[in-house]
Amino acid sequence: MSKTAIITGAAGGLGKGIAERLANDGFNIVLQDINEALLLETEKEFKEKGYQAVAYKSDVSKKKEQEELVQFAVTEFGQLDVMVNNAGVDAVTPILEIGEEELSKLFNINVFGTLFGIQAAANQFIKQKSKGKIINACSIAGHESYEVLGTYSATKHSVRSFTQTAAKELADKGITVNAYCPGVAKTEMWDRIDEEMVKLDDSLEIGDAFEAFSSEIKLGRYQEPSDVANLVSFLASNDSDYITGQSILTDGGLVYR
């Protein structure tokens, strides 16, 4: 029987790239996103390519909806094997201007959503009496905090912490928990970050902030979704069975830890 993976935030960007790679690896795919229109487009595209994929619209920040997502996957495909907590949002705000609304939004999605995904998947693995793999979206900002990305950085440090804690507590149940830490990618998220940084600095033009970050990458290019998907593919495979609690940088040589 083919294995099953849930990927949250899978309608576009890195999440879509991860989902396509796992589909090519032979997984049944549950595509989750809150953007229903884009989600259904991605589901159609996947099915046209012959992938075993179904879409599920939900809000990852709601614990009950994360539990229902996992149950949907089990109903559709019989069991769950891999949970990729990819969904996340960003914000670009100077430290003195960060407010309650931004904090609530980012922590609800990036932190609560990841934790609730960990819990829902782990409980299903335990119920199945099977090993399972939980893979979280961290970031270079989970290793090093960045100016005007304070809230985002704080949420990704939290994701790294929950990844370590979950790995320690779930190891004796055969469940591994790891995270991938992307760097600078040409995605909608980075386009938004670039645009917001221009608003904060009159000397910048669109593309300048992205190029400034990219210029520091030692391997000489910005990140493609496939760079992240390759790591997630490994973490979802049996080859990674002896790795847990790690938040692995995949940034082309930008942050060194």
UniProtKB/Swiss-Prot annotation:
Domain of life according to the entry: Bacteria
Keywords attached to this entry: NAD, Oxidoreductase
GO biological process terms held by the UniProt record: acetoin catabolic process; fatty acid biosynthetic process
Class of this enzyme: oxidoreductase
Endpoints of the signal sequence: none
Chain positions recorded as NAD(+) binding sites: 6-30
Classification via CDD domains: meso-BDH-like_SDR_c
GO terms assigned for molecular function: diacetyl reductase ((S)-acetoin forming) (NAD+) activity; quinone binding
Matching InterPro entries: 23BDH (IPR014007), NAD(P)-bd_dom_sf (IPR036291), Sc_DH/Rdtase_CS (IPR020904), SDR_fam (IPR002347)
Entry EC no(s): 1.1.1.304
Catalysed conversion reaction: (S)-acetoin + NAD(+) = diacetyl + NADH + H(+)
A Pfam family recorded for this sequence: adh_short
Active site annotation, chain numbering: Y152 (proton acceptor), K156
Recorded family membership: Belongs to the short-chain dehydrogenases/reductases (SDR) family.
Function description: Catalyzes the irreversible reduction of 2,3-butanediol to (S)-acetoin in the presence of NADH.
Record's protein name: Diacetyl reductase [(S)-acetoin forming]
Organism: Staphylococcus epidermidis (strain ATCC 12228 / FDA PCI 1200)
Primary gene name: butA
